Amino acid sequence: MDVIDSNEIFRKFDYSSVITQADIDYAIQDIKGIIDSGNYWENSPKFQTKENIFARQHPTWMKFRMSFLFSVFQYFGQEVKVGKMQAWSFMTNKEGAEDRETLWHHHQHVLEPRMMSGIFYLHIPEDVENRDLCGTEFAPNGPENDGKFHVKPSDFHWLVYPSKYWHRPAAPQSSKYRFILAADVEIH
């Protein structure tokens, strides 16, 4: 399986000067609280939060929300008109691993407005077997076809890409939890 760092379609934006480890620690504790309260989907990767986590009114979530939005602007090289924006989190490990084939998804069926997606890796366990293969897997030609690849996860970065591309979380490689923040925004 091929692995890339980024390219002209799957782009990364560095927020290490804005988002701190304390922000990440706060977000992880908040996500654990959401999961512990039972507010997660049962038909998604275990555990995926139900609520729009960007709607939380806390300075930490504002940093994540605004950094994602600014990443989208950077992606286009200009400010663009946006619509609905939402985010959720995955808290996954080997014990909660699901059938990999059911996890593929995209927004290609939505022609207008266009959608952009983003992924922020909050925490990847230190004991993963291969860090390059623990982020997100993409299938630009569809899940049944050749050309699949992984994008290497980078700490303190947003990975931004058009939502029309098939994607899924990489298989968990640790019994410890991996925390991922995922977001979508409409572009008008």
PLM region descriptions:
Residues 1-81, 101:
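Non-heme Fe(II)/2-oxoglutarate
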Residues 23, 27-35, 119-121, 181-187:
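Short, Φ-rich (hydrophobic/aromatic) sequence segments
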Residues 78-171, 176-180, 186-187:
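Catalytic core of non-heme Fe(II) oxygenases with the double-stranded beta-helix
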